[in-house]
């Protein structure tokens, strides 16, 4: 039973650089990957299409896309009408929690991942959070992940009855964006299939100025390879 649980993993998969690399890492570590994506009425819903394109190419055993009406809750520039911050220096990004923070997003996503993992008999969940090159979101920190893992093992029938123990994997949490990209390239990833921008235009082209675009540009520069992203012309 334990070996069967270790064989499967639920991977939170947005279609961006981090989650795509995370899925590739899970596969490289020998897991059968079940990719989980969300359309939460985010302004950059184009990332879901990127996820749909990438999941089969990455060898996901299954790709589940769930719709969540987080725009009904609001509280974020990603789901409402508030402007997405632009041109924030990298060194200032984590000084305060930005307007692109979505209330409790990773807790919501991880809870769905936990439910699916229990049904699948999968003891492992992968999430591509990063605590170095990031925008200061509280639910990307190591202490948050550790707390969720403790909660998960108190929350479901399979753990309470002793048939599995949930492990939340964060293989990218201490890597820079450049290191993440280098790791992905080692695993054969094509980053032109990914989407990062928080505020794309109607054609899906990246703005080039939001936190996510700036970190993406920084990552490719650090990795020493051309950025394949299609940006809006300034």
From Swiss-Prot:
Its cofactor is Zn(2+). Binds 1 zinc ion per subunit. Zn(2+) binds at residues 197, 207, 210, 213. Pathway: Purine metabolism; 7-cyano-7-deazaguanine biosynthesis. InterPro entries: QueC, Rossmann-like_a/b/a_fold. Its EC number is 6.3.4.20. Catalyzes the ATP-dependent conversion of 7-carboxy-7-deazaguanine (CDG) to 7-cyano-7-deazaguanine (preQ(0)). This is 7-cyano-7-deazaguanine synthase. The gene is queC.
């Amino acid at each position: 039973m334990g070996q069967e649980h270790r064989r499967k993993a639920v991977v939170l998969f947005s279609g961006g650089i981090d989650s795509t690399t995370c899925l590739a890492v899970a596969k490289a570590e020998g897991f059968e990957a079940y990719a989980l994506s969300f359309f939460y009425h985010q302004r950059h819903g184009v990332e879901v299409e990127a996820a749909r394109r990438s999941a089969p190419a990455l060898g996901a055993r299954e790709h589940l896309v769930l719709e969540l009406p987080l725009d009904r809750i609001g509280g974020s520039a990603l789901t409402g009408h508030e402007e997405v911050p632009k041109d924030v220096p990298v060194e200032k990004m984590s000084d305060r929690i930005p307007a692109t923070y979505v209330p409790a997003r990773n807790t919501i996503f991880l809870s769905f991942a936990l439910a699916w993992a229990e049904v699948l008999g999968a003891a492992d969940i992968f999430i591509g959070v990063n605590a170095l090159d990031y925008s200061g979101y509280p639910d990307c920190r190591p202490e948050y992940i550790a707390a969720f893992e403790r909660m998960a093992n108190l929350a479901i029938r399979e753990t309470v009855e002793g048939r599995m123990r949930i492990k939340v994997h964060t293989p990218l949490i201490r890597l820079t964006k450049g290191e993440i990209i280098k790791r992905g390239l080692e695993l054969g990833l094509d980053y032109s299939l990914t989407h990062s921008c928080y505020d794309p235009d109607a054609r899906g082209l990246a703005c080039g100025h939001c936190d996510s675009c700036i970190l993406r540009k920084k990552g490719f520069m650090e990795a020493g390879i051309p950025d394949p992203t299609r940006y809006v012309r300034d």
